[in-house]
Amino acid sequence: QDAIIDNLSYKETIKKYAKTGDLIFMDPPYIPVGKYEDFKRYTKEGFYEEDHIELSECVKELSDMGCHVILTNSNSPMVYKLYADFDISVIQTKRFVNSNAKKRNGEDVIVNAPPRYRKIVNYGKAVLPKQNKSFPSTRYMGSKQSLLQQIANATSSYKFDSVVDLFSGSGV
């Protein structure tokens, strides 16, 4: 009932809302790793290599200002280059868009960019609110259903009141 819906780019959203202590989850169009992959069509303007470079600079700035950023992407050499300053975990995933069931397995990464100028305090294990069950999971292209527990684990030591999925489409 108190929701605010803005139609802004991720840069405009960050400029308007990001503040020290925030947890920011980013699920941008992935860097293509296969011959037939083309995830830049998710937006009208496209999302190209230069956009990924700008996004990585934004993640570094957010971390420097005291935000904790969790970012997902494909397991691509470019991701390791762009986010070399941060921890990167590889996660086995399923793809439902390949006509060949044997080729539906993949690997994504979770980039963990903690706040750089804040003391980290463990407040205990995070429990997902019951509200999350009210939303259907996305069972399409970029579903993060299989990553929710890893994301919850990665953020369990941080206290926050809200989460913004800047590249929404995950259903949570």
Q: What positions do the PLM features span?
A:
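Class I S-adenosyl-L-methionine-dependent methyltransferase catalytic core
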Residues: 1-172
